[in-house]
Curated annotation (Swiss-Prot):
Residues 115-119 are annotated as: Interaction with DNA. It is found in: Cytoplasm. GO terms for molecular function: DNA binding. This is Negative modulator of initiation of replication. Its main location: cytoplasm. InterPro entries: Arc_rbn_hlx_hlx (IPR013321), Ribbon_hlx_hlx (IPR010985), SeqA (IPR005621), SeqA_DNA-bd_C (IPR026577), SeqA_DNA-bd_C_sf (IPR036835), SeqA_N (IPR033761). It comes from Aliivibrio fischeri (strain ATCC 700601 / ES114) (Vibrio fischeri). NCBIfam families: PRK11187.1. Belongs to the SeqA family. GO terms for biological process: negative regulation of DNA-templated DNA replication initiation; regulation of DNA-templated transcription. GO terms for cellular component: cytoplasm. Keywords: Cytoplasm, DNA replication inhibitor, DNA-binding. It comes from the Bacteria. Homodimer. Polymerizes to form helical filaments.
Length: 180
C-alpha cells in the first residue's frame, strides 16, 4: 500500500463519494476511475469540475443540502467517530453533529416523542419529569438534553425520526443508524 498526500478539498471530495461504511479511499478512487474513460481523465476532468462548481453555486439550496450530506459522511468516516467504543457515545456524537449541521431544523425535529416519554428537552428536569429512570444527558454543543436509558435500537430509532424530520435522505439515515 502506498501513501499519497492530498489537499483538504480533494480529501473531502473523496470522502463525500463514500457509498458504504468501511469503504477505503482506494476503493472509492478505483470506483470513480472505472466510471470514467482514460481520455476523459487526461483532459476534460478539471474543466468538468469547474463547470459543476459554477452551476452548483447558482443554486444555494442544493449546495446547502450537499454540505449537510458531506458533513454527515465526514463524521461517519472520521477517526474520532470510529474510535468511539460505546453506542451511547456514538449516539451523542451524531446528535451533536446534526445540531451543528442545521440547528434550526434540529430544534424543530426534537419534538419527537415516544408513547409515554419525551426524548429531547432543553433542560434535564423536563426529561426526569417524564420518567424517573430516563438518565438524561446533555448533547454537547447544543442547548438540548436527551434520554439515554434506552437500548441501542431505540437510540437508532430516535436518530432515524430526527433525521427524517430534518429532511435527510433515507439511505444516509440508514447508514448513520447502522453506525450507532
Amino acid at each position: 500500500m502506498k501513501t499519497i498526500e492530498v489537499d483538504e478539498e480533494l480529501y473531502r471530495f473523496i470522502a463525500s463519494q463514500t457509498q458504504h461504511i468501511g469503504e477505503s479511499a482506494s476503493d472509492i478512487l478505483r470506483r470513480l476511475l472505472m466510471q470514467s474513460s482514460p481520455s476523459d481523465l487526461a483532459v476534460s476532468a478539471p474543466v468538468e469540475v469547474q463547470k459543476k462548481g459554477i452551476v452548483v453555486s447558482k443554486d444555494a439550496g442544493k449546495e446547502a443540502s450537499v454540505d449537510r450530506v458531506k458533513a454527515v459522511r465526514t463524521l461517519l468516516i472520521s477517526d474520532e467517530f470510529s474510535a468511539l467504543d460505546k453506542a451511547i457515545d456514538r449516539f451523542l456524537t451524531v446528535l451533536s453533529e446534526l445540531y451543528k449541521i442545521d440547528s434550526k431544523a434540529f430544534s424543530e425535529a426534537t419534538e419527537v416523542k415516544g408513547r409515554t416519554r419525551v426524548y429531547f428537552a432543553d433542560n434535564q428536569e423536563t426529561l426526569i419529569a417524564s420518567g424517573k429512570t430516563t438518565k438524561p444527558r446533555e448533547i454537547v454543543g447544543t442547548p438540548f438534553w436527551v434520554i439515554t436509558n434506552t437500548n441501542t435500537n431505540r437510540k437508532r430509532h430516535m436518530v432515524e425520526l430526527l433525521m427524517e424530520r430534518m429532511g435527510f435522505q433515507h439511505d444516509l439515515t440508514e447508514k448513520v443508524c447502522a453506525a450507532i
